[in-house]
């Protein structure tokens, strides 16, 4: 068997360096070969490890999947095998395995691969079981099946990502590729004698001399970085207002360090007379499962008894209360210390609310890795933190892996393959001159060319998203590479630097039968904008139109505000018009700044989700820019209906929106007259005039005044008069705020608020009735 010699060299290398390896087995009859390789691994590694943890991952455990697993299982009874489906891979976050066996006959979902490979320990091997390596990129996977949306079929899938995946396996060290019929495709070239291989000792860890946490806690650390983070977080015991920013690549023990720190803090706080509340939040509870695991480990090591109320709440001696809540919910309680893990995945507005409310906050975030945020979070957020005058700011960057040694070829392979290490172009003053002169070209990415040729521009493009957007997952890039209904455009300076990127999805063009199903409860994959328009506004014809949904638009942060986003949108509009599309649109978490950007570029708000996103704390909105007369009529109708619904739903559904944002949402480029006449009774007119001429209070005519203002909002013709401080009227009439709340929010006295309202209503009254 010509693989054994190379396999022994691979084992030798990973043992010596505490690195990891991959063995790709191509072909159907791999069972004897794989069982032999596993036996060799077991016999050698059992000398270094007490227990060899093995994980088998498959798409399912029935039919052919089950047959392959059971046939292998009967040959390797010397290993205890844990089994899991790819879709459940979140369950293994924080765990560590020595052997990974991935059934990849029909599976290649990038997010899952990222999660799974990152659980592999040093001196560990991942086995990829592939049907046919030579024709790997021709294979259809379940990822492709999930991508499809009407009217596309499986044969429309592009499969460029699969080519990249295959190509990268051929490029990196510590990877063997073996075909059961053709033999070795990729070998290990370095000479290394397995019998002489022994693991390197771990670097010596130095504990701080003046440490406050117990040695029992510190000795749970695996790296110097973890020790340094614990030492840094001892400062939480000081009286100062403080913020900590801890950033790391994946697999650096960040969450474990936070858990150990909380256990160390708890031990010391138990000696105080005060009751303490410690809050923990993250985009999902799964992000902090490792934190809780190490919190409990630290408490147990310190012999501290605790009560586990739920997996999200721990109480220590009725004195220290530690709990997890979702990002938007945690603001409901005052905490002595707040831990925010994977902070980059939480809306910036919520993070700013934390800073207003809490005196001691720990923000941590992954920089690369499948849930990475890129450099932007640490760079931009740290810049903001440093501007705060009343907080002491601490920062630490964790770089040492806990599962394996640095310079691991498999980590390098993973980051490169999934484009996790992408960086955008650096910009300088000469670039800014080109931008000022609009010396740039806009074009659709030649996706196949970039993926097949490993063009550096691909990483520059992806790097913009990593730099400018908080949440980036490998699936997003694979979707762009493979999905038939996704494409991307870039704005490239004349010197070749990419400065802006737009990821789009083709939507609409839906047939009558599918539309009828959508009117009930059918939700077609993709087609986000047509689906919402059909379901919420019952306008069937819109789904027949063809449009482009902007999935993401991003500019390199240093040159934001120079008009590049607007320039790209203008160019995209022209491209869509030339190619006979009916509209371009987008769906995004609404903030004042973002909505202003879209409205400035002539996009019209037509929908607002009825619920906030629990992670970002924002309502999702849909904006559309019509391209032709037919779509213009529909968008105008949608905009009127949306404005009517918003006005009448605010006090019930959107009561937590700020007045300024509501006013922004009600802006429209269209001229409307309300669909009804304002017919007031004689009594209503009498009370209104009594209020405006002063003998009666606002309260005596509040119902009529509100009717007037709503009519005024709906009316957008040219003869509409302007009124001052309209946000105040929004607060009173649409949000139903008391004068006390208006006074507090707008920082004016109550009698002044009453004067403003009366003055503005008088303007509206004179316009309507005089």
What does each of the following model-derived ranges do?
Residues 93-100, 105-199:
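N-terminal accessory nucleic-acid engagement/regulatory domains that precede
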Residues 59, 65-96, 283-331:
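Inter-Walker segment of RecA-like/P-loop motor cores
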Residues 258-260, 552, 558-576:
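Conserved acetyl-CoA-binding loop-helix of GNAT-fold acetyltransferases
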Residues 2-59, 240-260:
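Glycine-rich P-loop/Walker A and Walker A-like loops and their local beta1-loop-alpha1 context
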Residues 155-202, 209-224, 383-427:
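Conserved coupling/interface region of RecA-like P-loop/ASCE motor cores
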Residues 485-505, 510-513:
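Conserved beta-hairpin
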Residues 2-11, 218-242:
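N-terminal pre-P-loop "Q-motif" helix
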Residues 300-318, 325-328, 337, 349, ...:
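Terminal substrate-recognition subdomain of acyl/acetyltransferases
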């Amino acid at each position: 068997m010509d693989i054994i010699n190379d396999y022994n060299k691979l084992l030798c290398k990973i043992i010596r360096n505490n690195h990891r390896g991959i063995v790709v087995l191509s072909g159907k009859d791999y069972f004897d070969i794989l069982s032999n390789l596993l036996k060799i691994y077991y016999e050698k590694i059992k000398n270094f490890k007490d227990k060899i943890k093995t994980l088998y991952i498959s798409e399912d455990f029935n039919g052919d999947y089950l047959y392959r697993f059971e046939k292998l299982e009967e040959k390797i009874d010397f290993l205890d095998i844990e089994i899991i489906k790819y879709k459940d891979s979140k369950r293994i976050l924080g765990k560590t395995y020595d052997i990974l066996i991935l059934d990849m006959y029909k599976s290649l979902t990038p997010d899952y691969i990222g999660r799974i490979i990152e659980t592999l320990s040093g001196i560990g091997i991942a086995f990829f079981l592939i049907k046919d390596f030579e024709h790997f990129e021709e294979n259809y996977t379940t990822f492709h099946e999930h991508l499809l949306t009407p009217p596309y079929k499986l044969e429309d899938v592009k499969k460029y990502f699969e080519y990249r995946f295959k190509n990268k396996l051929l490029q990196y060290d510590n990877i063997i590729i073996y075909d059961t019929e053709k033999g070795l495709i990729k070998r290990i070239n370095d000479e290394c004698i397995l019998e002489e291989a022994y693991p390197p000792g771990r670097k010596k860890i130095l504990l701080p001399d003046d440490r406050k946490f117990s040695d029992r806690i510190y000795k749970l650390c695996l790296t110097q970085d973890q020790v340094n983070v614990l030492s840094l977080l001892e400062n939480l015991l000081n009286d100062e207002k403080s913020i900590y920013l801890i950033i790391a690549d994946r697999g650096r023990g960040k969450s474990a360090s936070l858990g150990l720190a909380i256990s160390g803090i708890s031990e010391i706080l138990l000696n105080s007379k005060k009751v303490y509340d410690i809050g923990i939040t993250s985009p999902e509870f799964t992000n902090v499962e490792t934190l809780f695991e190490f919190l409990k480990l630290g408490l147990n090591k310190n012999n501290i008894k605790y009560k586990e109320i739920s997996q999200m709440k721990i109480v220590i001696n009725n004195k220290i209360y530690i709990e997890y809540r979702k990002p938007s919910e945690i603001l409901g309680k005052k905490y002595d210390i707040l831990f925010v893990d994977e902070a980059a995945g939480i809306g910036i507005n919520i993070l700013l609310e934390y800073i207003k409310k809490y005196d001691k906050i720990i923000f941590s975030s992954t920089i690369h890795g499948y849930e990475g945020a890129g450099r932007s979070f640490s760079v931009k957020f740290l810049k903001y933190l440093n501007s705060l005058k009343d907080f002491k700011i601490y920062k630490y960057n964790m770089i040492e892996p806990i599962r394996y040694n640095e310079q691991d070829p498999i980590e390098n392979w993973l980051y490169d393959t999934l484009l996790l290490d992408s960086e955008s172009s650096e910009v300088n003053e000469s670039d800014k001159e080109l931008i000022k002169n609009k010396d740039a070209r806009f074009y659709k990415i030649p996706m196949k060319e970039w993926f097949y040729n490993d063009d550096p521009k691909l990483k520059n493009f992806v790097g913009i998203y990593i730099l400018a957007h908080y949440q980036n997952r490998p699936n997003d890039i694979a979707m762009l590479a493979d999905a038939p209904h996704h494409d991307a455009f870039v704005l490239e300076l004349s010197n070749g630097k990419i400065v802006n990127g737009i990821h789009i999805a083709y939507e609409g063009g839906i047939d009558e039968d599918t539309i009828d199903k959508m009117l009930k409860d059918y939700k077609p994959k993709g087609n986000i904008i047509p689906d919402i328009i059909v379901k919420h506004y019952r306008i069937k014809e819109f789904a027949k139109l063809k449009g482009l949904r902007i999935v993401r638009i991003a500019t390199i942060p240093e040159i934001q505000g120079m008009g590049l986003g607007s320039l790209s949108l203008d160019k995209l509009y022209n491209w869509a018009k030339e190619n006979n599309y009916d509209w371009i649109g987008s769906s995004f978490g609404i903030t004042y700044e973002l909505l202003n950007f879209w409205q400035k570029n002539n996009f019209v708000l037509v929908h607002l989700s009825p619920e906030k996103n629990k992670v970002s704390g924002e309502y999702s909105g849909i904006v559309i820019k019509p391209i032709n007369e037919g779509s213009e009529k529909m968008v105008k109708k949608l905009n009127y209906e949306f404005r009517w619904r918003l006005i009448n739903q605010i006090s019930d559904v959107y009561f937590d929106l700020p007045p300024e944002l509501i006013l922004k949402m009600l802006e429209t480029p269209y001229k409307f007259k309300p669909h009804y006449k304002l017919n007031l009774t004689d009594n209503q007119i009498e009370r209104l005039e009594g209020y405006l001429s002063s003998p009666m209070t606002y309260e005596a005519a509040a119902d009529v005044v509100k009717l007037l203002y709503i009519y005024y909002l709906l009316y957008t013709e040219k003869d509409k008069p302007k009124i001052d401080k309209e946000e105040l009227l929004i607060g009173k009439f649409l949000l139903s705020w008391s004068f006390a709340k208006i006074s507090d929010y707008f920082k004016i006295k109550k009698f002044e608020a009453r004067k403003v309202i009366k003055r503005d209503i008088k303007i509206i009254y004179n316009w309507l009735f005089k």
